[in-house]
UniProtKB/Swiss-Prot annotation:
The organism of origin for this protein: Brucella melitensis biotype 2 (strain ATCC 23457)
Statement: the UniProt record of this protein carries the keyword Nucleotide-binding: yes
Broad class of enzyme this protein falls into: ligase
Catalytic activity: L-glutamyl-tRNA(Gln) + L-glutamine + ATP + H2O = L-glutaminyl-tRNA(Gln) + L-glutamate + ADP + phosphate + H(+)
Record-stated family: Belongs to the amidase family. GatA subfamily.
EC number of the protein: 6.3.5.7
Gene3D superfamilies in the cross-refs: Amidase signature (AS) domain (3.90.1300.10)
InterPro entries attached to this UniProt entry: Amidase (IPR000120), Amidase_CS (IPR020556), Amidase_dom (IPR023631), AS_sf (IPR036928), GatA (IPR004412)
CC annotations in GO: glutamyl-tRNA(Gln) amidotransferase complex
Originating gene: gatA
Keyword terms: ATP-binding, Ligase, Nucleotide-binding, Protein biosynthesis
UniProt-recorded name of the protein: Glutamyl-tRNA(Gln) amidotransferase subunit A
GO MF annotation terms: ATP binding; glutaminyl-tRNA synthase (glutamine-hydrolyzing) activity
């Protein structure tokens, strides 16, 4: 990790402003780091060398003229779910082979408008379906962290595994990511990085490949809370092209850092103490409670009675929406096309060859729960449960609770190619046990590293906030970060 790539976004921003470094030097340092490390970590599926250099050159020119944007010259990685004009956008699926969109997603357009530099597209679980980044057509991503005294490869979490691994390994200053059931927060927790899923509607979904439209939200993964706040300010906007986009001013999230949490009411949900939760997770949770208490926050016990139904309801709603969204991939207009004896056969052959195993599984579950005989029994019921989950949170917030503290994941990062998890999808789905509820309720949630386990692997805590009160999350997460310190993996790649 070079001196330049070790800079946080906030530090790089200050050095660029002071003309102590140039955007070109910073970008070249990241491109060299990617070229040296990507064979080992597999975080990038496309590296845009020429585009990055020309964007950095334009940034240097704007800085020289005194016209620098909020992210001028900051090199970022982009999850392969965001449309980037003329650049590989395949949701890491075989079915989108060769697809290069003619348009730019709103999130990336916002970042480029603020002067950020694109380093390339980041690996992810296919169509964002997965918790380990093992379902990608481009192969798994390796976590930059390893257990003490071990050379075994670990997963970086998913679906934004490439984003989290690239940030942790200093292969980008920060990254875009998406979260449908935990895909920002779980990989952030597994890699010692910070990830925030904003309130549903805070960040535009336009130009982002859809998985489950009522749950998907884009957000940043960054090295620390300040960097996440800086990125989120640029990513969030009102967008008339997204009907779920909310017309609320975007606050200066960075300004929330350092504000006192004295008197802030933090809820601890008793339902999150799940059976079989490792002692190290319980210990971490207690540590987080103490950090906030020491900073003057008031800790209160709360109840979210419908928590246990969140995961099963999520795995009905998300596949149902996915089966509908993924019906558009048929090999006719773009992507992979496998010839067939007639049009119906061509559709079948293309979809059979183009989708991976996990995506097929979820399409089939979704089609099943939406089918005539089962719609009421499954889908309708799951939506009713979702309403009850939302009400649980509304009741808690009505009692004056400002934020809720929970573990981010039920364990540290697990081994790559774990046979038990590979053969039992439900065990894999349990990785999202603490995160899916936030998507079901449309609330903001942040994962912040809070310590290392006995094997030296990072563990994260999650803070859940009221709708559109991300500032409170940044404020409280910053307190945890200041108390716990920061965590960087030892370089092996």
């Amino acid at each position: 990790m070079s001196e330049l790539t070790a800079l946080t976004i906030a530090e790089a921003r200050d050095k660029l402003k002071a003309k102590a470094i140039t955007a070109t030097e910073l970008t070249d340092a990241y491109l060299s780091a990617i070229d040296a490390a990507n064979d080992a970590i597999n975080a990038y599926v496309a590296v845009t060398h020429d585009q990055a250099r020309s964007m950095a050159k334009a940034s240097d020119e704007r800085i020289a003229k005194g016209e620098a944007g909020a992210l001028e010259g900051i090199p970022l990685g982009v999850k392969d779910l965001f449309a980037t004009k003329g650049v590989h956008t395949q949701a890491c699926s075989h079915i989108l082979d060769g697809f290069k969109p003619e348009y730019e997603s709103t999130v990336t357009a916002n970042l480029w408008a603020d002067g950020a530099v694109m380093l390339g597209k980041l690996n992810m679980d296919e169509f964002a379906m997965g918790s380990s980044n093992e379902t990608s057509y481009y192969g798994p991503v390796k976590n930059p962290w390893r257990a003490k005294g071990s050379n075994a490869d670990l997963v970086p979490g998913g679906s934004s595994g490439g984003s989290a691994a690239a940030v942790a390994a200093h292969l980008c200053a920060g990254a875009t990511a998406t979260d449908t059931g935990g895909s920002i927060r779980q990989p952030a927790a597994f890699t010692g990085t910070v990830g925030i899923k904003p309130t549903y509607g805070r960040v535009s979904r336009w130009g982002t490949v859809a998985f489950a439209s009522s749950l998907d939200q884009a957000g940043p993964i960054a090295r620390d809370v300040r960097d996440a706040a800086i990125l989120m300010k640029s990513m969030a906007s009102l967008d008339l092209k997204d009907t779920t986009s909310v017309d609320l001013p975007v606050p200066d999230y960075e300004a929330a850092l350092g504000r006192s949490v004295k008197g802030m009411k933090i809820g601890i949900p008793r339902e999150y103490r799940v059976d079989g939760m490792p002692g190290e997770i319980e210990e971490l949770w207690q540590k987080g409670i103490q950090y906030l208490k020491d900073a003057g926050a008031e800790i209160v016990d709360i109840s979210l009675p419908h928590t246990k139904y969140a995961l099963p309801a999520y795995y009905i709603v998300a596949p149902a929406e996915a089966s509908s969204n993924l019906a558009r991939y048929d090999g006719v207009r773009y992507g992979l096309r496998v010839p067939g004896k007639d049009i119906a056969d061509m559709y079948e052959q293309t979809r059979a060859a183009g989708f991976g195993k996990e995506v097929k599984r979820r399409i089939m579950i979704g089609t099943y729960v939406l089918s005539a005989g089962y719609y009421d029994a499954y889908y309708l019921r799951a939506q009713k449960v979702r309403t009850l989950i939302k009400k649980d949170f509304e009741d808690v917030f009505a009692k004056g609770v400002d934020a809720i503290l929970t573990p981010a994941t039920p364990s540290a990062a697990f081994s790559l190619a774990d046979e038990v998890l590979a053969n039992d999808p439900v065990k894999m789905y349990l990785n999202d046990i603490f995160t899916v509820i936030v998507n079901m309720a449309g609330l903001p949630g942040i994962a912040v590293p809070a310590g290392l386990n006995g094997q030296g692997l990072p563990l994260g805590l999650q803070l859940i906030g009221r709708p559109f009160e991300e500032e409170t999350l940044f404020q409280a997460a910053h307190v945890i970060e200041q108390a716990a310190g920061r965590f960087t993996p030892a370089k092996w790649w």
